[in-house]
């Protein structure tokens, strides 16, 4: 459903690059507001990303533990990574990240949803998939990635979400959507 409230739309009337990094690009735009006034919008331009929640035949999900420097904590997440190019197929990115971070290959990968991660200051979208029919292989992370693979029942992952112990937004969405999907399929 596309929202059509045209009285809310802001029009860009100026733009400048503040920072141009390897991953992120910071912009400062001047916008015309719906009431005719102007405002400044600082935002992060991001190439987008894909994430995948791997589900083993025995009902366990595969998660990854890694240190996240910006929050200074080790997190429990689903495998994910940025699109290598703006036109990269998100499904190919999800497949690559699954293999790199966990070593697994999947027979089936299905789209769960797409989420806008931080709509107040970034244009990043993450495409979230579920992977089944998994075959184990060798993990091959990037040189600057240090990741531990963790397997647990989906029910335990849901419990960790509800306790606030899994708090990464893409992972919360994926775990809860997969649980819902599993319940719906069980009722068919």
Predicted region positions:
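Long hydrophobic alpha-helical segments typical of transmembrane helices together
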Residues: 158-188
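Acidic, metal-coordinating catalytic segment for phosphate/diphosphate chemistry
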Residues: 14-51, 57
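Short beta-strand-to-turn element immediately C-terminal to the catalytic PLP-Schiff-base lysine
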Residues: 55, 130-131, 179
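Short glycine/serine/proline-enriched coil/turn segments at secondary-structure junctions
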Residues: 21, 70, 118-121
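Unchanged
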Residues: 39, 48-51, 82-169
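Residue-level detector of beta-propeller blades
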Residues: 12-13, 111
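Conserved Nudix-box catalytic region and its N-terminal flanking loop in Nudix hydrolases
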Residues: 2, 7-9, 41, 51-53, ...
